[in-house]
């Protein structure tokens, strides 16, 4: 196989100014991961959101995290918990109280994004929810989360889902 010279690494080539810096989507993914853990803690321990946020900011390196988005999720999900749970309930085969707490945290976060962050495409919300469930949930938790979000997205983002499926 003949190699193309242009594919070779040249240490003299200038690096782009943002080389090595995480993208906006990567920073948001990190924010979602930390927020999932923080929401789980809020659900289980019923600590104040400000205490949880302060603890997470001390215990975690926020260099590669969208800290504002983390805060928005952490405070937004509890603020709209009733609306979120009411939206989720018709898409569940179990009562909310019977859900695994990790999967509940993921579903609440994803539902909040579908309801309150219409700038985030529904397909991104579903994918991120699945990835969070793979990282933090039970063995097949991501399949459950996927099924619920697939039912929920058309209910909350009907026009967007229809436009994509054309």
Curated annotation (Swiss-Prot):
Alphabetical GO biological process terms: DNA-templated transcription termination; transcription antitermination
GO MF terms held by the record: RNA binding
GO cellular component, one term: cytosol
Chain residue ranges for the region called Disordered: 1-30
Composition-biased stretches (Basic and acidic residues): 1-18
Keywords: RNA-binding, Transcription, Transcription antitermination, Transcription regulation
Protein name listed in UniProt: Transcription antitermination protein NusB
